[in-house]
Amino acid sequence: MSGDSIHRRRMALHCPITSLILLLIAMSAHGYNIDLPSYVRFRQSSNSMFGFSIAMHKGRSGFYGNQNNVSLIVGAPKFDTSRYQQGVTEAGGVFKCSLNDDDCKLVPFDSKGNNRNVDKEVVDRKSYQWLGATVATGRDSDLVVACAPRYVFHTMTPSRAFRIDPVGTCFTSHNFEEFYEVSPCRTNNWGYHRQGSCQAGFSAAINGNGSRLFIGAPGSWYWQGQTYSIPPDAKFPFKPPLYQPFGTGGMASSHDVTRPENQVFSTSESASVNDDSYLGYSMVTGDFDGDRSEDVAIGMPRGGNLVGRIVVNRWNMANIFNITGRQIGEYFGYSLATSDVDGDGLDDLLIGAPMYTDPDNVEGKYDVGRVYILLQGGPTEEKRWTTEHIRDGYHSKGRFGLALTTLGDVNGDGYGDFAVGAPYDGPEGRGVVYIFHGSPMGPLAKPSQIIKSEQLVEGAPYPRTFGFALSGGLDMDGNTYPDLAVGAYSSDQVFIFKSRPVAAVNAETSFASNSKLISLDDRSCQLVRDHKKVPCMLLTTCWSYTGRYLPEQLDFDVSWLLDAKKLLNPRMFFLRDEGKNIRNQTIRLNYGQKYCLNETVYLLDKVQDKLTPLEVEARYNLRSSRPLDPMVRHRRSILEPVIDQNREIVLRDAINIQKNCGPDNICEPDLKLKVSTVDKYLFGSPEPLVIEVFISNTNEDAFEAAFYMVTPPDLQFRKLQQLGEKKDTPITCSPPTPENNHTLKCDIGNPLESGKIAHFKISLVPEEKYGSSSSYDFYWEANSTNLEKPGSEYDNKIRQSVGIWVDTDLDIKGTSLPDYQLYKADDYKELENATKEDDIGPQVVHIYEIRNNRPSIIEEAEVFIHLPYETIVGDPLMYLLNQPETGGKIQCDDVAFNEYNLLLDEKLVKKSYLQAQGAIWNSAQVSGQSSSSSSSGGASVHIEKARGEGFVRGVLVSNSTDAGDKLSPKQVEQRRQEDTLEALGDASFVHRDRASQAVQEPQVNQTSFTTYSTSSSSSGSGAPSAQLRGHSTQGHIQMAGPVQHTSSSSSSNYRSWPAQQQQQHQQLLLAGSGGSGLGSPVTFNDKSQFGGRNNNFHTGTLDLGTLNRGNVDNELYRSQGQYQNPSQSLGQSQGQFQANANQGHYQGQNQAQFQARNPGFQGQTSYQGQTQYSGQPGGYQTHHVTYSSGSKPYYGRENEDFYDEDNLQQATPGHWSSSSSSSSSSGTRRLRRSNDKDGATEKPLQIDLNSPCQSARCKSIRCVVTNLGTEDGDAAFVAIRARMVAKTMEKLASNVPLNVSTLAVANVTLLPFIGAPKDAIVKTHEIFYKAEPEPLQVPDVVPLWVVVLAACAGALIFLLLVWLLYKCGFFNRNRPTDHSQERQPLRNGYHGDEHL
């Protein structure tokens, strides 16, 4: 071929490609179906803040097909109304804007001036009230509400002075015919400490049928916030009489006011911890519990300790559940909206957090913003709100999510869509609106359309704060597609964007060949140019379209690109356009009818590349008469349809070239597959898993020969390497993905000719996640598109399993800070008298380090840390100050700390002991730091149910919240005293007191009392029944009633724990104090209390080092009953027995006496406590984990690792059993991880049920380590900060050293691929702390005669000095002769001092 012909062909190729690129630009120029050139703009006077709030209003006749009454309600809160209202300036206005007349008319919601009382005194101020700051409409009603949250009401003091209370007010109207005022906070509850600053109307919402009006008042009660539910048709007096609440005293209505639906409901005041929470900042209505009745979601952006909270209530303000944010200061709940995003018919909740900042960004970005999309769904009530999607903003300071609105189904695909406003986003910070489309799985990952302020008009100035207000979901122009309204209050402009009809196109293109092969020898076509015979094939393309509001016919621009993978050297061309592989055409389709085009394509005479498939690409788009420039405004232009761009608009199909294979043109290859690899692979090894593959063809050519390997999901494909000296067979592979069922496909020749081989090796590496199988199961296959000879396929498939070798070594170490310390007990106080932490004793920090010293990862391990929090007789010993500080991949269960609410040292609380010791390098890795006294918090999105029974998939379900606590009588009396001081004008100390209360945690938030009626016998059996009395709170968070709880147990006595704490079984262990001992576990009852002081923890005895062995001789128990002891006894006293007895039987009422003997000290200290128990010992060996009949005594050995099994029931007659069954999560059985997934009866090893304590009662802290690797950064650390109670140490050992230790027991619970290990892997480590009292200072003794002699000498010297002074006349008094000095007045420089 000549050079000119080659040049012409390349030019012919270049021109169509350019046309194709221009076509693609035209397709994306106007975005999707929110049309920009046809927008409608409304303006008002400058600085009126026109567009601050907007709401689409359907009106009485505004349904699809009749748009005469569909309008847009726009608020302008600084609009000057002095022409309409006498004596009022900038009261604000509300406008009704219509597409029909292109104008906005002022709606006379409030046309009167300031109100006056009977004495003609002005009682309110409407100037600057910001009417129009909030507007809302009913979805299926003609009700409209407009609010003025800065409206001021004046209440009169006894001295006739004005009070200025910004109570706020709202106005309602049905279709703008009559207007009524609703001001729920205009009462006698003046002052910001009550409802004087409530700013009612800061937010408002109307349910779908217009039967309920919701008004938010975020300023009530020190800005805790409040929400009202009001019947909109009721008429209310100007102000309720006396101190009655809103909704009483003269309410007039045409309905029965005794019915609940005609009454006013509101949330009540909460505890001071919820001050400045702003409940009522935003709200939206919807069915959030599936009862087909609309509820209301209320924003509380500063609630939940500043992370934000959404309170979801029913129409009568009964709480359903709450949702808490994740990040402090993100303003979670600033904006709210609902939309059926996944198309399941349920309302999904959209939550805006415009102040969200990514803490991991390194670019200094802040206020990026975030939107949370919570999908309502799930098979059970607990999983209704467990699906969450997050969409983050894109630019710093953009405040993505400041405005939200539903769009309905804007593109006609059956899924709800929504818009997100970012009013400070964009190239110049003028604002951007993002459009998101729904799908069956939730919102699409990326916005379907982005509308920037700079795209709106033909040049500057562009509007600012574009997207500050949004409204959508209604069809404004009558084409059945909902439209979008956007407010830009800084520019006093509002825009309405119309939606274009969407055509859903179904299209396909394919070659007319079932085998997808074309033979070069089949030359059935002839070229016109040179009459050559060429191989050819038929290409068929079909289209059809459907959709709403579409014309009967549509024109489409279509194009084809042949051999798309080889644009520079194409091999396939159109027969009608010889030498061209690109074709453009315009077609006309009829609505709902399928239209097909057939084109004959041919191949070149000589094809060098026979391996690359021949691929065709077909594209289509609607033909448009509109110019491509989107900046030109075409306001009155007809909205042309647009294709659904969520569908595939590029169609593809491919065929392969077939070689000649004999006279029958049928090739029968014979592929042989051989694979070699290891039998066992070490998990965690740095070397990859290598698989060597050898494929040979011993018969005819194999077309599209391929190798398939189904890989386990836990392995990742790394690389493929060809082997052998001759690499004449190219190999290309597509990596395994979930979409192709984790199948690696390698093309090994097209064709793989006879006698050729493919020899290569594949490298695989494990992923970070771990499967549940103990081996890697592989399936290999080699095949081709042409079938082999029957009977020869047996060597084409291989199945093989590669075992997984897991090698781990759990190691635990620890240190004490300090490990030795001198103390002086006189410098400290009793714990009951202490007020701050350093009053009770010296601080000690125990740090544990958990490592893995072998290559395989430990997927999960449990660590139990036992610390002696009190002696066996109940004296506090080691006082826990904080939640454990953790570093690495470890989490610890919450444990009660600082139970006496001592004032903690802030520096010590904030200090990271792990970082100080070099365990971690970044303070962000530290967790567990808390300064509260009895609880810990987090910043994660969770849902709190009004009635719950545990945890659901990481979503907390609780039955009470801080924001709904009812005021106690003491708090009510405090409020009354504050009101008195406020009225007298002296309330400064009230403000300080409230501020201090707001930052303190309450000691006790709720209590649970459990009563049991039991019938028991001497064997300890019984059938107890219990009623758990839940508390009921009144307010905006929870309205719960009593909860019935019934449980049964095989014990006659057991403890019931609070429902929100980890359930643990409490036992009093009477164990030995020496090298071996015997004790029978006994259970007892108690009252459970949540928050504040709580001693409900697992008890037992702990070896206290030298205290146990060197300084304590005995522990005596005096029994009012019988005792038999074949071993040695202590003394001859009847009823006494020694604690280290090997066996014995005891019963009755006991008193415990502790006796200590120390050199140089004579004395006895007694502790008394009463415990009823009865039992008979059996046998138990700690280190071999064996049991014998009866209950569980303990044999202990010094310095030996300890672990125990689960507290299984052993119901032998005459013995105790501590297991129980319960109908809820609250019971006496300790929570544990269950590895018995397949229902096996074998119980896993449990090391936490019976603490290895021997001489003290222990508190057990459970921690879970995950993914413990071998790298330096994989180690896990736990630091426990406590203080030793000096007074208790003095009682135990007043002048000798005292050794106290904590013990950590680690147990591997989960290994990768294996699960729970068959043999227990338990490691222990004990940290010792030695405390020694300071030695007493013995003063030097002075002889008595020296003292007497010194006293006599001093007396003589004193008498001599007196005598000398007397002789000198010191004791004689001489008065002055001149008395003039005494008559001078005492002026001191001031008039009037003469009378002093």
UniProtKB/Swiss-Prot annotation:
Name one process (GO BP) from the record. cell adhesion mediated by integrin
Indicate the principal place this protein occupies in or around the cell.
membrane
* Residue ranges, compositional bias (Polar residues): 997-1006, 1082-1099
The UniProt entry annotates FG-GAP repeats at: 36-106, 117-174, 186-239, 266-317, 318-383, 386-445, 452-514
Biased amino acid composition, Basic and acidic residues: 963-979
Q: State where the protein is found.
A: Apical cell membrane; Lateral cell membrane; Basal cell membrane
Q: Does the keyword Signal apply?
A: yes
- Quote the SUPFAM superfamilies the UniProt record gives: Integrin alpha N-terminal domain, Integrin domains
Protein keywords: Cell adhesion, Cell membrane, Disulfide bond, Glycoprotein, Integrin, Membrane, Olfaction, Receptor, Repeat, Sensory transduction, Signal, Transmembrane, Transmembrane helix
Q: What is this protein called?
A: Integrin alpha-PS2
Q: Which organism is it from?
A: Drosophila melanogaster (Fruit fly)
